[in-house]
UniProtKB/Swiss-Prot annotation:
Alphabetized UniProt keyword annotations: Oxidoreductase, Pyridoxal phosphate
Lineage: Bacteria, Pseudomonadati, Pseudomonadota, Betaproteobacteria, Rhodocyclales
InterPro entries: GcvP, GDC-P_C, GDC-P_N, GDC_P, PyrdxlP-dep_Trfase, PyrdxlP-dep_Trfase_major, PyrdxlP-dep_Trfase_small
Protein task: The glycine cleavage system catalyzes the degradation of glycine. The P protein binds the alpha-amino group of glycine through its pyridoxal phosphate cofactor; CO(2) is released and the remaining methylamine moiety is then transferred to the lipoamide cofactor of the H protein.
Cofactor: pyridoxal 5'-phosphate
UniProt entry tagged with the keyword Magnesium: no
UniProt-recorded name of the protein: Glycine dehydrogenase (decarboxylating)
A GO MF label: glycine binding
Length: 972
């Protein structure tokens, strides 16, 4: 047990003094004494007994996890550093949507490496997320300005999935009745790969051809690339107009850096613009994570995927920000949702937005102009040397006819430290980026045998005015809002970042007990490797011999995950939990199709399921059939059996979460899986609650055929304020041949019998650069630590449930009165009696310095608490004290001491303006100011002040405004 030691360390053996398990005691919050205290409180003599009372014996593992023992932090870092050293860093000129960039140090240190930014949750509780929301609004404004469209969302997962979302959005809003979607053949190949996967599942017909031929197509929509993958810049205005005249919806995939200079997609008439924001300060990271941008016309807002930040007002009339139009999202509309996307890429979107804030419009124009100038110099030098370089307009990318010298030149550039793109046996591609230097261009020209001097070439290019005709340059102002024209010194930027951070509550302040979200410790030692150059600066399509370290780390992590889940194969490609669901269901569908069972399209989903489940099933072309739950929160076995029998001939899958979203280990889970299997279906296990399984049971042991793992929950990747996430899937052997592959780069398993399965994400290993976080966590915890983490997560949840049960009914428990790793408190009786709702309790918790638990999921009118294993007894007791004090405040309403509409809950959260009565009014509420803002003695010691009062959600949805507001509005 961590933290236990003999009376004198001088008497301890060396094996103990080595402290190889020290990290376990850093990660698991309660020490041995606190564990004993909590066990006594819940009436269990030891952890083993508690687990026996909680987890059904039929699904328990028969042996410990087949993993090594724990490693000390320094040793795990050294081991991973040795693996990373096997990667070879080259100056990348591959392009294809991934480019070198300089992350400003002030953003790297104060955002990317700052737990105040990376440990926050998605900003559902907007009053304590105003800093992040302002940053995202800046990002949206940046995208709006550069794309020339009216509305942008707060990011999608990557450019390729954004293109797939554009295709499905086009189908929703297009007037054309065609089933054809036209794709510019000069789109990036990874985008085409993802489009093929999505279109096949929806039954869309893809038609490929040159962009200029799109106007002749009878299609419901089209995707055009600008600049295209060959680097060409073509004015698409006429093509767009012709397509729209036929009732088609037109999407343009573009490049934000190019759009600093180029005519915008909106100006050319596009309905949708999308692409990657990666080159705005986010490292390539072997494929991700990066924020994809997505913009459209305001008329399409209700059909747009992803989250949107909008402007509203608070109870004092002050400008306040929130996520707007949430009724579009999967957690509300389920199988009718626009998309299954839940987690997106908030941390990376914020970094890209801050990149624009820091550089401003003039700085960005200088960066973009420099990139173009270097590309133009390179083109001119190559032409002068006799190479055939296409004469059309370009921004940063050239495709050079190298003929029989292609292999020789590629090898020479490799030896000199450059990666070029081998387009074919006779053509090489070169993409210039922010990190390219004049010396690089001079070296490349020398390698190609060109003799021109850089200065002379520069003068020649300058006299010609570059390689972009005036008609293709933008003539409108961009980024005119003051936020993009103020913070250009490091002092000002640093203070702006700190001001925003101070408005947000993250794990660096207090526990975040969101049920089904697993907001556990994101240890510093786990985070350190993601900024190592060996992981951060590799292109996802770099030659395989240069990425041996990445492949070894990924293979090692896959081995860890196989041990934890019991599955035969792991696919790392899905870059969110929802994408994992999608990838797993795709594998199931293709498995059935391979057996001739193309009619198996029914997916059974319990009523309690997360909204992504039905949304993902719908995306895979499956028909969702809902299974009822009984009064104990379990799957209703009679209803399941009836529906399994009813749909036996068409049954494709059951999607089920375990432990259930009701926070209990269902004892009939094996029977449920067996019933589905008997009728020809497959079992998809949602891995949202895997944190209650690790080391005790596993998806494969339970009977699942495929499951995703939320690495941003169970395996310590931080939530980033709403992303990044990773959702790799584990598959049984019979499904392994049907997991995603990739058209550009191998996914690591060269022996799979089935090829051409298609991609679900842009990069072969998804957001590869954050995988070291999970590798470090598992390496440092080892077999014993992972099991202890699960046991303590269950103990902490039972302790919270036990302490709060006399104040709030615990809605569901197992047969022996235990909950799993989370518990649901029923607020409905309180609301019926007083009008005080779960929302009021959530807002009041802000006054105590806590983020609310999950509200109204999976049962309306409830709150779901998941404390995780990382919170110690002191923090649990503070949260419990806050909840009990709030219940006593509710009793004051129940007994008539406070009005139902004027009490600390209905008026929560309280701000500094409330406390000091800034408007000069006297305090006139029936409770004291101290009760409002310092309700318990310890609150004042570390007070978190919400920066706004309760936000008016209805006003925000009815008065849609999703761009930056005047600066003075923030002070109103």
């Amino acid at each position: 047990m961590p933290n236990a030691s003999p009376a004198s360390p001088l008497n301890a053996p060396l094996a103990e003094l080595e402290q190889r398990d020290a990290f376990i005691g850093r990660h698991v919050g309660p020490n041995a004494t606190e564990i004993a205290t909590m066990l006594a409180a819940v009436g269990a003599p030891d952890l083993d007994t508690l687990i026996d009372q909680t987890v059904p014996p039929a699904i328990r593992l028969a042996a410990p996890l087949p993993l090594e023992g724990p490693k000390p932090e320094h040793e795990a870092l050294a081991d991973l550093r040795a693996i990373a050293a096997k990667n070879v860093i080259r100056k990348s000129l591959i392009g294809m949507g991934y480019y070198g960039t300089h992350t400003p140090a002030v953003i790297l240190r104060n955002v990317m490496e700052n737990p105040g930014w990376y440990t926050a949750y998605t900003p559902y509780q907007a009053e304590i997320a105003q800093g992040r929301l302002e940053a995202l609004l800046n990002y949206q404004q940046m995208v709006i300005d550069l794309t020339g469209l009216e509305l942008a969302n707060a990011s999608l997962l990557d450019e390729a999935t954004a293109a797939a979302e554009a295709m499905t959005m086009a189908r929703r809003v297009a007037k054309s009745k065609s089933n054809v979607f036209y794709v510019d053949e000069a789109c990036f190949p990874q985008t085409i790969d993802v489009l093929r996967t999505r279109a096949g599942l929806f039954g869309f017909e893809l038609k490929f051809g040159p962009a200029h031929d799109a106007a002749n197509a009878d299609a419901f929509g089209a995707l055009l690339q600008y600049p295209n993958e060959r680097g060409e810049i073509i004015d698409l205005s006429g093509t767009v107009a012709a397509l729209k005249a036929k009732g088609a919806v037109v999407a343009i995939a573009s490049d934000l850096m190019a759009l600093v200079l180029l005519k915008s997609p909106g100006t050319m008439g596009a309905d949708i613009a999308l692409g990657s924001a990666q080159r705005f300060g986010v490292p390539m990271g072997f494929g991700g994570p990066h924020a994809a941008f997505f913009a459209t016309r305001e008329a399409n807002v209700r059909a747009m995927p992803g989250r949107i930040i909008g402007v509203s007002k608070d109870a004092r009339g002050k400008t306040a920000l929130r996520m707007t139009l949430q009724t579009r999202e999967q957690h509300i509309r389920r199988e009718k949702a626009n998309s299954n996307i839940c987690t997106s890429q908030v941390l990376l979107a914020n970094m890209s937005g801050f990149y624009a804030v820091y550089h401003g419009p003039q700085g960005l124009r200088t960066i973009a102009a420099r990139i173009h100038r270097l590309a133009a110099i390179l083109a001119q030098g190559l032409r002068d040397a006799g190479f055939n370089v296409p004469a059309g307009a370009f921004f940063d990318t050239l495709q050079v006819d190298t003929g029989a010298r292609t292999a020789e030149l590629l090898a020479a550039c490799d030896a000199a430290g450059f990666n070029l793109r081998p387009v074919s046996d006779t053509v090489l591609g070169l993409s210039v980026d922010e990190t390219t230097t004049g010396d690089d261009v001079a070296t490349l020209l020398r390698l190609f045998g060109a003799s021109g001097e850089l200065a002379a070439l520069d003068a020649k290019v300058g006299a010609a005015g570059g390689a972009i005709p005036a008609a293709l340059l933008r003539d409108d102002a961009i980024l005119t809002h003051p936020v993009f024209n103020t913070h250009h010194t490091e002092h000002e930027m640093l203070r702006y970042l700190k001001k925003l951070q101070n408005r947000d509550l993250a794990l660096d302040h207090s526990m975040i007990s969101l049920g089904s979200c697993t907001m556990k410790l994101n240890a510093t030692s786990e985070m350190i490797p993601i900024t190592w150059a060996e992981f951060a600066n590799l292109h996802p399509f770099a030659p395989r011999e240069q990425v041996r370290g990445y492949l070894e780390m990924i293979d090692g992590l896959a081995g860890y995950l196989k041990a934890v889940t019991g599955f035969a194969a792991i696919s790392m490609q899905p870059n969110s939990g929802a994408q994992g669901e999608y990838a797993g269901l795709v594998a199931i569908r293709r498995y059935h199709d391979s057996r001739g069972d193309t009619h198996r399209r029914v997916c059974l989903i319990p009523k309690s399921a997360h909204g992504t489940n039905p949304a993902s099933a719908q995306m895979c072309g499956m028909d969702v059939v809902v299974v009822a739950c009984d009064e104990r929160g379990n799957v209703d076995l009679a209803d399941l059996e009836a529906k399994v029998a009813q749909h036996a001939d068409r049954l494709a899958a059951l999607m089920i979460t375990y432990p259930s979203t009701h926070g209990v280990f269902e004892e009939s889970i094996r029977e449920i899986c067996a019933s589905v299997h008997r009728h020809g279906g497959q079992v998809y296990m949602d891995g949202a609650n895997l944190n209650a399984q690790v080391g005790l049971t596993s998806p494969a042991t339970i009977g699942a055929d495929v499951s995703h793992m939320n690495l941003h929950k169970t395996f310590c990747i931080p939530h980033g304020g709403g992303g990044p996430g990773m959702g790799p899937i584990g598959l049984a052997a019979h499904l392994a041949p049907f997991m995603a592959d990739h058209v550009v780069a191998a996914t690591g398993d060269e022996t799979r019998p089935n090829k051409g399965q298609g991609a679900v994400s842009a990069a072969p290993f998804g957001s590869a650069s954050i995988l070291p976080i999970s590798w470090m966590y598992i390496a440092m915890m080892g077999d014993t630590g992972l099991k202890l983490a699960t046991e303590v997560a269950i103990l902490n949840a039972n302790y919270v449930a036990n302490r709060l049960a006399e104040h709030y009914p615990v809605l569901y428990t197992g047969s022996q009165g235990r909950v799993a790793h989370e518990c649901i408190l029923d607020i409905r009786p309180i609301k019926a009696n007083t009008g005080i709702s779960e929302v009021d309790i959530a807002k009041r918790l802000m006054d105590y310095g806590f983020h609310a638990p999950t509200m109204s999921f999976p049962v309306a009118g409830t709150i779901m608490i998941e404390p995780t294993e990382s919170e110690d007894l002191g923090e649990l007791d503070r949260f419990i004290a806050a909840m009990i004090t709030i219940r006593n405040e509710i009793r004051e309403v129940e007994n008539g001491a406070w009005p139902t509409d004027d009490n600390p809950l209905k008026n929560a959260p309280h701000t500094q303006a409330d406390f000091i009565a800034a408007d000069g009014a006297q305090w006139s509420r029936p409770y004291s100011r101290e009760q409002a803002v310092f309700p318990l003695p310890w609150v004042a010691e570390n007070k978190f002040w919400p920066s706004v009062n309760r936000i008016d959600d209805v006003y925000g949805d009815r008065n849609l405004f999703c761009a930056c507001v005047p600066i003075e509005d923030y002070a109103s």
